Structure formats: C-alpha cells, structure tokens
Amino acid sequence: MTHSPLAQFDIKKLIDIKMFGFDVSFTNSSIYMLLASILALTYFYLAFYNRKLVPSRLQVSAEIVYNLVADMLNQNIGVKGRKFIPLIFSLFIFILFCNLLGMTPYSFTTTSHIIVTFTLAILVFLMVTIVGFVKHGLRFLTLFLPHGTPLWLAPLMIVIELFTYLARPVSLSLRLAANMMAGHVLLKVIAGFTVSLMIYLKFLPIPIMVILIGFEIFVAILQAYIFTILSCMYLNDVINLH
C-alpha cells in the first residue's frame, strides 16, 4: 500500500488533540497549510521590506502577482471591487502556495482534499451572500429571478437559479480538489513507469518527466487563478445586480 498512488493523500496525525469532545488534532495537512502561509508571508516580506526605486527581481515578481489580482477584480467588478483586494489576494496566494508546495518531493498537497477546498469555497460563498444582503437588502433575492422572466415561468426559474447558486461552493471545491489529485496521481504513476523504463532506455524517460512536472506546475498556478477569478465573478453577481 505504501507504493499506491493514493498513499500520498493520506492524512496522518502528528499531535493528537481533543477539545470539547471534538478531534482537532494537528495533522500533516495542518502543517503544510501553516508552512504555505509562512512561506507566503516570508516571500512578500522579503519582496517589500526594502523597496527601491529600481525594484529587485523579487519585488517585481511580487508586484506582478499583486497586479494580477487587482486587475482580476477591476475587470470583473470595477472600482467597487477594490475594497475586496486584501481578501481575494490572500485567497489566491494561499491556494497558490499550497498547490506549489505540494509539487515538492515527499510533500503533502492540502488542496487535494475536498474538506480543505470546500472550506475555502464555503467561506467565499458566505462572504458573497453577506455582501449581497448588506449592499442590497431583500433586493438581493432578485438575483434568483432574471429580469424579463414571464410570470408563469417564475417559480421554475427561481428553483433553477437557487439550485445553481447553492451548487457554487460544491463545484468550486470539487474542481480544485479533483484537478490537484488527478495531476499528482498521474505524476506518481508515470514516475513509477519512468524508473522501470530507465533500465532499458537509460535516461530517455527523464525529459518526459521534466515536461510533465512543468505541466503540473502550470496546472497548480492555473487552478489557483481559476478559483480566484470565479470568486470574483460571484462577487460581481451580487455587487452589480442585473
């Protein structure tokens, strides 16, 4: 079982903690989420600690990431989205660092677990819903009835739109977890074949593995971007009601 491609996703208790009858143990998932947060904070601290007129490469890379998120909000929401930059930026960076940290050998990918991605998705869902009610009050409920819908079709449209709205955190979380898990399983399986093929083909399979790892890094970045841009689109729906 130790060689199973799925063994890399096993959650292991490091510190057993019971609190008020609940199991809140510190696991390998917990430590990698904490490590991702520390690495992200360290990266931006070093990038902006001693800002210069002629920025360093580290500062430039950090500014590119920040501008990416700021542009994402501006394009999807407009000026009204600026106040959400800290939240959306933190979300993007956390997912990005968790995804990339999972690419290091013998590490653990926290975003491959639905409990982690669903928690992030439900936080986005609650934030979007609260923003909608705070900004529009009961008028927010018009989101579930598209403008111009015939009266006889209204009950059906409300049910469909409500179901679609409630399904958002599920689809958002499943997309991220499934893509990260599938990619790592594929990498593990092909890596096993590569070791066997090297007996006969020498070093020929190595470039294939390098290309595959490069593709997985691209997917890790892309999935963080998709999760974030969908969050921006959901925010736009409740801020700019149509």
UniProtKB/Swiss-Prot annotation:
Matching InterPro entries, A to Z? ATP_synth_F0_asu, ATP_synth_F0_asu_AS, ATP_synth_F0_asu_bact/mt, F0_ATP_A_sf
A Pfam family that this protein carries is ATP-synt_A
Give one GO term, molecular function aspect.
proton-transporting ATP synthase activity, rotational mechanism
Q: How does it sit in the membrane?
A: Multi-pass membrane protein
Write out the annotated subcellular location: Cell membrane
* Membrane in keyword set: yes
- Enumerate the HAMAP family for this protein: ATP_synth_a_bact
Report the PANTHER family cross-referenced here: ATP SYNTHASE SUBUNIT A
Described by its record, this protein's role is as follows:
Key component of the proton channel; it plays a direct role in the translocation of protons across the membrane.
Q: Which family does it belong to?
A: Belongs to the ATPase A chain family.
Kindly provide the name given to this protein in its UniProt entry.
ATP synthase subunit a
